[in-house]
Amino acid sequence: MFNKVTKTFQYGQHSVVLETGEMARQASGAVLVSVEDTVVLATVVAAKKAKAGQDFFPLTVDYIEKTYAAGRIPGGFFKREGKPSEKETLTSRLIDRPLRPLFPEGFYNDVQVVIHTLSVNPDIDPDIPAMIGASAALAISGIPFNGPIGAARVGYVDGQYVLNPTATQLKSSKMDLVVAGTENAVLMVESEAKQLSEEIMLGGVVFGHEQMQTAINAIHDLVRDAGKPDWDWQPAPKNEALIAAVSAAAQEGLNAAYQIREKQARTTKLREVYAAVQAAMAEQAAQAGQPAPDSVGVDNILFDLEARIVRSQILNGEPRIDGRDTRTVRPISIRLGVLPRAHGSALFTRGETQALVVATLGTKQDEQIIDALMGEYRDRFMLHYNMPPFATGETGRIGVPKRREIGHGRLAKRALLPLLPAPEDFQYTIRLVSEITESNGSSSMASVCGGSLAMMDAGVPTNDHVAGVAMGLILDSGKFAVLTDILGDEDHLGDMDFKVAGTETGITALQMDIKIQGITKEIMQVALAQAREGRLHILGKMRDALEGSRTELSAFAPRMLTIKINPEKIRDVIGKGGATIRALTEETGTQIDISDDGTIVIASVDETQAKEAQRRIVELTADVEVGQIYDGSVLRLLDFGAIVQVLPGRDGLLHISEIANYRIANINDVLKVGQPVRVKVIEADDKGRLRLSIKAIGGIEQQQSGTAEPAAQSEPQAE
């Protein structure tokens, strides 16, 4: 019934099993990947024909996590998985990026790659098994694909590279780098690091590429035993006559368009050229008595012609599209404190790319609780990236963030994360929002720069500025050029784009996408060195605008006071059914967070109210000391004395003989319920019962004359 084929290989400290032939047999390709209790099923299906008029490659990659993989039932009302989580979206992008360049040019059939996570070991992230599974499923499917690819995670612990570290090992690692590629070339890198040098980062890329050959070889073995016949697919023959006609009609106009330095004017000119060429081709066909050529085909020829013009200009040493040389960063403008009510804000403009980044400070209650498959955790730092269509002068949909926005936000977050102060040094929750108001390339790196400035403007004590720069590379016939601070057009027309973010000390985030083979380690070294030069230039501009974090928080940011109490006193602060803490927060307008170790954080925009809440908590939790004097209140009268409250929840007996320096016949003659009195604690027995005295501090007659001894002041243990 089943023709099951299995391949096993050792991959770092883990054993990996590839299986096919038992599950999802009607898919074009299906592979089950198991890595020590983490199990993923990768499937691929391709349409046999491209849709009519299709002018791009419609690849869809969906990475899907099921809660049963972790032995859990989904939360919420519906009890089934809903929209993709951020982790699912990011992993889908991670898998898509190295696969997409390996499909042949002109292949426009629908291809859908779906990866289901079926079982999860909390110590082994499913993303690397998912990438290997997707590669293997494509390799055995027979679909036109210039793979397979391998993928590896690289850590850096105690000065050594670690292949596929566990989640536990990553906590002590200075690097979390994912690299994917073929036998001969690296195609994709995604990394975060704790200010590591370019040499260490590149070493991690090379190490990962060397180690992934084991996975690639195992996939080749699987293909030999279980591969389906290759598709009989050939790209459509090139219409040389049409190419020549389009080139002749468009060359002059395109050359003129790429002499225009301003983006909007250049785009307008290009649209005019495209429209004129389409009209000319239709007219020529009509004169020849032939049908008009396919408009998609004409547009593709024009795009190729654009690419040749731009690439040849750069490789020949001519100015780039906007007139710069290969190493120059666009002009930078920085404005701080743009929004008067925001806690921190920065408007970062680099050429025609602009980001308005806003920092908001919150309390522990504002932390994001993430119910991840590998375990629930709280996130105190959020970065949300938004790019509305007006940023590129277009119309479009506004609503739920797209995959690209989620990916760019995650990259910027990775870049800033290593510079955040420790929670014990800065207890605020931090949310950054990057609103891209203009875009012509490198908007994610503008978000990094703006985010660093906005946090410093808000008074977040970050250790240093973080800057990011997007780089490009053009390689042709052995000649190459590395481009600093690329434009959007250079991104589309180049062979590699990579984004590097970091401080003067080192790199904090690296993202690399390579569209061709043949980019060597030496070329990457040159590119990273040039990126460092650009990053340091930007850091200099940022320091000129703001040397370091502001020492004062915004007047609109919550103020936090921290006190430490005996953990056994927590119940006194909370009260029965939460009544005490609820009354405290409502009456003072504060937020109060209580940790199990007795640490209490009080937050309020009004510092006076925060201090009032602090005073009341200190009173609630203070220990009564023998010999101390307290301002109390008479709770009730007895024949032989009175019960007096000295602190909230603590009262004692004031005997009639300890009230005055004379004999009192009737207690009602000197005290009333609710009367404030100053008392001294003269005794506390082993059960905590208190004996009080007014006579010991001069008697009731002194208090009535206004010459009583002052009461003790409770000192809060503020941190």
Curated annotation (Swiss-Prot):
Provide the alphabetized UniProt keywords.
Cytoplasm, Magnesium, Metal-binding, Nucleotidyltransferase, RNA-binding, Transferase
Q: Per the record, what are the reactions this protein catalyses?
A: RNA(n+1) + phosphate = RNA(n) + a ribonucleoside 5'-diphosphate
EC identifiers of the protein: 2.7.7.8
From which domain of life does this come? Bacteria
Q: What range(s) does the KH domain occupy?
A: 558-617
Q: Does the keyword Membrane apply?
A: no
* Subcellular location per the Swiss-Prot or TrEMBL entry: Cytoplasm
Q: Name one GO molecular function term.
A: RNA binding
What is the annotated role of this protein in its UniProt record?
A: Involved in mRNA degradation. Catalyzes the phosphorolysis of single-stranded polyribonucleotides processively in the 3'- to 5'-direction.
Disulfide pairs here are none
UniProt lists the family membership as follows: Belongs to the polyribonucleotide nucleotidyltransferase family.
| Catalytic class of the enzyme | transferase
Cofactor names = Mg(2+)
Q: What is the protein name for this chain?
A: Polyribonucleotide nucleotidyltransferase
The residues that the entry says bind Mg(2+) are 491, 497
**S1 motif domain location, by residue?**
627-695
Just give the chief location class.
cytoplasm
InterPro entries, sorted: ExoRNase_PH_dom1 (IPR001247), ExoRNase_PH_dom2 (IPR015847), ExoRNase_PH_dom2_sf (IPR036345), KH_dom (IPR004087), KH_dom_type_1 (IPR004088), KH_dom_type_1_sf (IPR036612), NA-bd_OB-fold (IPR012340), PNPase (IPR012162)
A GO-annotated cellular component: cytosol
Tell me a GO biological process for this protein: mRNA catabolic process
Protein source organism: Bordetella bronchiseptica (strain ATCC BAA-588 / NCTC 13252 / RB50)
